[in-house]
Swiss-Prot record:
Keywords associated with the record: Cell inner membrane, Cell membrane, Membrane
Protein function: Could be involved in insertion of integral membrane proteins into the membrane.
Pfam families xref list: YidD
Name of protein: Putative membrane protein insertion efficiency factor
Membrane topology, from the record: Peripheral membrane protein
Cellular localisation: Cell inner membrane
């Protein structure tokens, strides 16, 4: 079971949700990755907290450009993740 979300993680997840609901529909689908960068960010923040989750999200967003092939890289397993990978 994952630890409870910090206030910082909650704020960042709320900002990502605003982006998903208000801005992303206007831009159209263009993410090179599955899951999308915003979904990846939410999962990273939930698994790792505000510092490492933000770092993983920024690294992912910086890779989202025409010269990168994209792909399906999942969020790494977190310290409380008990699922088999």
């Amino acid at each position: 079971m994952a630890p409870p979300l910090s206030p910082g993680s909650r704020v960042l997840i709320a900002l990502i949700r605003v982006y998903q609901r208000l801005i992303s529909p206007l831009l159209g689908p263009h993410c090179r990755f599955t899951p999308t960068c915003s979904s990846y960010g939410i999962e990273a923040l939930r698994r790792f907290g505000v510092i490492k989750g933000s770092w993983l999200t920024v690294k992912r967003v910086l890779k989202c450009h025409p010269l990168h092939p994209g792909g399906h890289p999942p969020v790494p397993p977190g310290p409380f993740d008990t699922r088999e990978h």
